[in-house]
Regions:
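Noncatalytic alpha-helical scaffold of FAD-dependent oxidoreductases
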Residues: 2-594
Length: 594
């Protein structure tokens, strides 16, 4: 086991300054954001924790009662307890339901409470730069260039360096009933780190980016939540350790955020998603301020619930992950091939058959004709691409021979389904160049419409229904007058669209088109999000996708763990009633025969 006690290499200067606990610049303060409602009295949970009687003052043991009397008393007490439990549980649920549209509490502290909380945070952390109310910093932590959901700034941003620091912040938040929003890589596309309208505390975990332990013999690694997956893999490579962490969402994504959104990426067809077995355990600060470690480091365990997974996909609403143990996997040789098809249906059929052959596939990506046109226009490729629906394969295997065999099987299957121009990289550099064209999806897409911005979204359907989804969505966008590229993790039915727009009018068109795409995916037995998460943007679809029982169970878990709804309020959990402006279900169009 080697212990890495330095920050990751991505900002060596910045990280070393973080280690000292303070930054050099001083930041002016501004008043806290106004709150809407006063705090309310402590819950039963607080009473329980604060009323334990020391053993030395416990009452003496009473005289032994007769068995019959004991039985009658037990039955009576059971009835009373059940009745009170039912009353308080249902009273609390009814009270919560009346307090917000989601059925979760929204009774936060007053503006004065928030001011006192900020002052206590400054006193607790001492260093001015550990607690900031600088307007620019608040804006960065409440708004995003990655999406077009409404922004809202926090009242204060705190920069912890350890789990203990996070606990201190959460205890202050509890004391003053101040909402808490976790923040790290800021790569979210669905508004996950927006502050609630009342303001609150933003906990910026980006400074907690250290690798704490590497266990090469066990193929795992312990790191803080702010560590970025790319930096982790680069560190392993620099140390000559032939292992890597295979989840590959957007550049800059951190381990904490990846857990929170249940992310994946292009490698999902081979390695699965964050909801698989890639996170062995996590250190989590609960809304009460209690710290738990979800399990030990064994590769598998059947001891009780898999508590780690409770926090994967919870989007910071149940707890704040501060450390995690992640599984690593061997680095194997890879190569890349590209092939063109007459249409998406035949490309999908070819990809499905290749996967069923058991070929060593690490990634298989669908890029539509508009994407290939955009790649040519972007001008960064080493070649001129045929502007047709295409598949990008990344093959993986232990030897060069195994890679060639996999590529040959893929070529034969592709040609069987009408594929043409199969091109296999001749060396590592050519493979890197080919794959880079796929990774440039955002920038090449924006080149398709000069001066445009882009709305990126994702849905996922069973693989057999992906051609129908792509066809209907492209037809919809064409009729709407929007320019878009389509990229899909075709091996698992995950479909991404980048909708370009220049004007506010086109932005609204894009917003409605995304809504129709989501409704279409759910109607095809799919999901509103394959890997971006729910956040603000997709929460209204959960009742339709998951059903009332499942959503209410999620809310019950939330109320139990976070009765004050302090952790990341406004995300994930949908309103109790459907929106009055909800659009009708789109008509499904039968795909053309091609």
């Amino acid at each position: 086991m080697s212990s890495i006690l330095r920050p990751l290499a991505r900002h060596s200067h910045e990280s070393s300054v973080w280690y000292s606990g303070c930054r050099s610049s001083s930041l002016p303060s501004i008043p806290a954001t106004t709150a809407r409602s006063p705090a309310y009295s402590p819950s039963w949970r607080q009473i329980r924790h604060n009323s334990q009687t020391p053993s030395e003052v416990l009452p003496s043991r009473p005289k032994q009662s007769s068995p019959r009397r004991t039985t009658v008393l037990a039955i009576a007490l059971s009835g009373i307890s059940a009745g009170l439990g039912y009353y308080f549980a249902h009273t609390q649920i009814a009270w919560d339901a009346a307090s917000s549209s989601t059925g979760l509490s929204n009774k936060y502290g007053t503006p004065g409470d928030f001011e006192r909380a900020i002052q206590e945070l400054r006193t607790t952390f001492g260093c001015k730069d550990a607690v900031s109310t600088d307007p620019n910093i608040l804006h960065v932590h409440g708004f995003s260039e990655n999406d077009y959901h409404p922004g809202s700034a926090p009242s204060v941003v705190v920069f912890p360096q350890s789990t203990e620091d996070v606990v201190k912040v959460v205890k202050v938040a509890n004391k003053y009933k101040m909402p808490v929003t976790p923040y790290s890589g800021a790569t979210s596309l669905e508004g996950h780190f927006r502050a609630p309208s009342v303001g609150g505390i933003c906990i910026d975990l980006s400074g907690m980016d250290r690798i704490l332990e590497i266990h090469e013999a066990d193929s795992d690694l312990v790191c803080q939540a702010g560590a970025r997956w790319q930096d982790i893999n680069e560190t392993l490579k620099e140390k000559g350790i032939p292992l890597f962490f295979p989840l590959d969402p957007g550049p800059g994504a951190t381990i904490g955020g990846m857990m929170g959104t249940g992310c994946s990426g292009t490698n999902a067809v081979r390695y699965g998603t964050a909801k698989g077995e890639w996170f062995l355990n996590a250190t989590v600060v609960l809304p009460s301020g209690e710290v738990i470690k979800t399990r030990r480091r064994a590769r598998k365990s059947s001891a009780g619930f898999d508590v780690t997974k409770l926090f994967i996909g919870a989007e910071g609403t149940l707890g704040i992950v501060t450390e995690a143990t992640i599984r690593l996997t061997p680095v194997l040789p890879t190569t890349v091939a590209v092939v063109q098809f007459p249409d998406v249906r035949r490309a999908t059929e070819a990809a499905n058959e290749v996967l069923r052959q058991g070929v060593g596939i690490q990634c298989v990506e669908l890029c539509d004709d508009e994407f290939m046109k955009a790649t040519n226009k972007y001008g960064q490729s080493t070649r001129k691409w045929p502007e047709k629906d295409s598949l990008f394969f990344k093959f993986q295997g232990p030897t060069p021979r195994s890679l060639k065999e996999s590529a040959e099987i893929a070529r034969r299957v592709a040609e069987k389904h009408g594929g043409t121009g199969f091109e296999l990289a001749r060396n590592e550099q050519e493979a890197a160049d080919l794959w880079q064209d796929r990774k440039n999806a955002l920038y090449s897409g924006l080149a398709l419409l000069e001066g445009s911005r882009g709305w990126s979204t994702d849905v996922c359907v069973p693989m057999s229904r992906l051609p129908q989804l792509v066809y209907e969505t492209k037809k919809d966008l064409e009729e709407t007058g929007l320019v878009s590229t389509v990229v899909g993790h075709i091996g698992d039915g995950n479909f991404h669209a980048l909708l370009m727009f220049r004007t506010d009018e086109d932005l609204e068109k894009a917003r409605h088109a995304v809504h129709r795409m989501v409704e279409r995916a759910i109607a095809l037995d799919g999901t509103c999000t394959g890997e971006h998460g729910v956040g603000i943007g997709k929460r209204k679809y959960l009742y339709e996708e998951l059903g009332t029982g499942t959503v209410e169970l999620m809310k019950s878990i939330k109320r139990t763990i976070d009765p004050y709804n302090l952790f990341n309020p406004g995300k994930l959990y949908p309103d109790n009633r459907p929106s009055a402006e909800r659009e009708p279900q789109p008509k499904l169009v039968k795909p053309r025969d091609t």
